[in-house]
Amino acid sequence: MRERVRAGERGAFAELYEHCAGAVYQHALWLTGDWSTAEDIMSETFLTAWRARERVDTEGGSLRPWLLGIATHKAENARRGLRRRVAFLARQRRTPVVADFAPEVAGRVDDARRLAAVQGSLDRLRRHEREVLTLCVWSGLDYQQTAEALGIPVGTVRSRLSRARAKLARFADEAQKKTEPRAGRGEMTGEAALAALPVREETA
């Protein structure tokens, strides 16, 4: 696959898109909290990959880490202009639901709430911590693949992820203290759930 992509074979790029477009879109969605922006980032990622195909190393495994690395940088750039739009999504809970479309709209609103909550947690992390967390935890890359995607050492991936988890755990403790009278026994906050998600170990 790598040799075919590097050679500019359109069939290889079609296969790459089919296998990885969903992962790229979902990764961009988690980082930006906006469906439309995530779609744009997905398209831009593959366009950038096509233009940079000659830099692909013919040795190696899946190209997914490479694509997610491109998407990460584009998403972080897009985040700067998305704060007002994320706030809009969070306000949709107050939008009346038309009966004929109630299930679809209600599902969309629920997704918007979750995305807004995730964005609130991610916004409290530093950019480098946020990038590593989303790649390792949500996009399912192992430490080595995340290092490849971001162009940093594996040790740096581990340390940044550790700091991100520690901060999320601290945020969860703070949130629990503020809402303790209303919290259910054993109930996890969004930050605690994020901090507890596992990371895939390196593949052999």
Residue spans of the language-model regions?
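C-terminal edge and immediately downstream basic/flexible tail or linker adjoining helix-turn-helix-like DNA-binding
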Residues: R4, A87, R93-R94, E148-A149, ...
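A short, charge-rich alpha-helical start-of-domain segment used by transcription regulators
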Residues: E3-Q26, W50
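Residue-level preference for hydrophobic side chains embedded in well-ordered alpha helices
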Residues: L16, C20, V24, A28, ...
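Arg/Lys-rich amphipathic alpha helix in sigma70-family domain 2
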Residues: R51-T58, G69-A90, R94, P103, ...
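Helix-turn-helix DNA-binding module
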Residues: D40, G120-E131, S139-T156, K167-R170
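Short helix-capping/turn signature of helix-turn-helix
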Residues: H19-G22, L31, T134-D142, G151
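Sigma70-family region 2
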Residues: R6-A7, W30-G33, E44-G61, G81-R83
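Acidic, proline/glycine-rich intrinsically disordered inter-domain spacer in sigma factors
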Residues: T95-D123
